[in-house]
Amino acid sequence: LSLHDALPIYLRALKSELTAGDSYTPSAIFDSLPFRGIQLASDDNMLPDSMKGFAPTIHGIAKSNAQVTIRQNGYTIDQRYVSPGAFTIDDLYSTASSGDLSVEIKESDGSITRYSVPYSAVPILQREGRLKYAATAASYRGDSSQKEDVKFGQATLIWGLPHGFTVYGGTQFADHYRALALGTGANLGDWGAISVDLTQARSTLADDSEHQGQSTRFL
């Protein structure tokens, strides 16, 4: 292990990874940057398989001890029994394909209730209640011709909300540069899924002139 190799420390209580050394910043909000320093970030590999990726949360009401069957594109993807009253299913396995989920509640007397839950995804979407973050304090690790040691910080946050929405944001900062990004993503069902974000950046050049700009990204 050399001085600059990445040294990961797994923090299972936080489901996060602390990295010291050479690594890369996450690419979900800003472009990924090579760095030499310290980063604390959520680690999806510490989650159960049923909690990885995006899947909608299913809400329903059972009148009795009932069997709940969930299908997508004609295939059964989950089946379980629930007690009488309101229920929530938030641990569906993520699927690669889009397509509304068909929910069937079969009561103990044989009566059946059916309804659909929209499902479509873009990479930024998170499950309801999922909070994903990263914080970096480091030096930019460029190519061998780089002469100046450019120190920077970055922080990002992605939060899964009810009804298929996700909000996210982040900031980057260095001596003569600031950037702020804010965005949202949504599972729109038959209309598909979309994410849109706006980044505002400001920089100061060597002659002390200030420049700023905006960029918008749609996915």
Give a label for each model feature.
Residues 101-106, 157, 167-169:
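Conserved catalytic-core segments centered on acid/base and nucleophilic motifs
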Residues 61, 147-150, 158-160, 172-176, ...:
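Low-complexity, polar/charged sequence tracts that form flexible coils or short amphipathic helices
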Residues 143-147, 205-208:
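Flexible, membrane-facing loop/turn or short amphipathic-helix motifs
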Residues 125-144, 165-167:
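Transmembrane beta-strand segments of Gram-negative outer membrane beta-barrel proteins
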